[in-house]
């Protein structure tokens, strides 16, 4: 039986950060499932088009990759996402994958980084390894991408668990809630003087480089400094954290072992799984 492994991420057009994040995650997952042939897909058509125009390199979107896998006669497909939450991008991918359920003997989709409580706990433990020692008047501020999808609650849930584990952390988002002004109000209420600014994104790409750490007047760094905070920028994506990389590997392996199609909702039989349908 021919088996394929498809690793899906939002993608990035930054070579160096891709090599430190997406490429390493892909390699680790590939090495954990050596019986499967590897394929890659990005969900961002904007990034796909930019790379094609700039570098002459063609990267498939999920539909193109699945069509290619089907045309090459594969029987089984394991898909592992590198998305952070079960947001719009992941749910779009989930719907796309569901459309191929009748074309393969087995097609399974691994969950994003943050899905159920255990994921948050493991992510917090991983994050501890990248947070510097902080004084009582210091905090870490994470910039998440954010979403208008109902999964936006993942961000305050993450912050709650970080703080419950003794990490003086605040989580804001570029899109959705909470935004930087909400974070600043709470930083002032907490008498914070120094902010360690980090992206809560797989890669330190455009949002992190420009919206978070840029020198423009609307960047988080500039806004925080104008509000009187001493800002230390840590331009390192989650995908550079080896513990986060290994977390995605565990999701892929568990996905392969359980042969479940992951989505949002309680899974039958095993409460640790989130499924929308089981695929034979």
Q: Can you name each region flagged by the protein language model?
A:
Residues 1-258:
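Active-site-proximal alpha-helix that buttresses catalytic centers in soluble enzyme cores
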Residues 259-280:
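Glycine-rich, flexible N-terminal cofactor/catalytic loop recognition
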């Amino acid at each position: 039986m021919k088996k394929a492994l498809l690793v899906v991420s939002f993608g990035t057009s930054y070579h160096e950060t891709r090599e430190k994040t997406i490429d390493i995650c892909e390699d680790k997952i590939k090495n954990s499932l050596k019986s499967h042939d590897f394929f890659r897909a990005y969900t961002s058509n904007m990034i796909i088009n930019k790379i094609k125009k700039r570098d002459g390199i063609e990267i498939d979107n999920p539909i193109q990759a699945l069509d290619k896998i089907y045309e090459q006669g594969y029987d089984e497909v394991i898909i592992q996402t590198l998305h952070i939450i079960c947001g719009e991008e992941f749910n779009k991918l989930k719907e796309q994958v569901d459309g191929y359920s009748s074309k393969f003997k087995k097609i399974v989709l691994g969950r994003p980084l943050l899905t159920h409580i255990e994921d948050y706990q493991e992510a917090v433990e991983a994050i501890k390894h990248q947070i510097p020692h902080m004084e009582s008047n210091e905090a870490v501020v994470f910039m998440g991408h954010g979403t208008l999808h109902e999964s936006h609650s993942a961000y305050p849930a993450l912050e709650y668990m970080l703080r419950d584990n003794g990490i003086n952390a605040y989580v804001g988002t570029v899109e959705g809630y909470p935004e930087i002004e909400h974070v600043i109000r709470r930083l002032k209420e907490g008498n914070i003087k120094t902010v360690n600014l980090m992206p809560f994104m797989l890669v330190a790409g455009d949002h992190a480089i420009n919206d978070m750490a840029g020198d423009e007047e609307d960047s988080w760094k500039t806004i925080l400094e104008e509000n009187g905070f001493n800002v230390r920028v840590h331009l390192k994506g989650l995908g550079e954290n080896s513990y986060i990389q290994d977390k995605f590997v565990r999701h892929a392996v568990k996905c392969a072992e359980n042969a479940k199609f992951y989505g949002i909702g309680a899974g039958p039989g095993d409460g640790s799984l989130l499924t929308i349908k089981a695929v034979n």
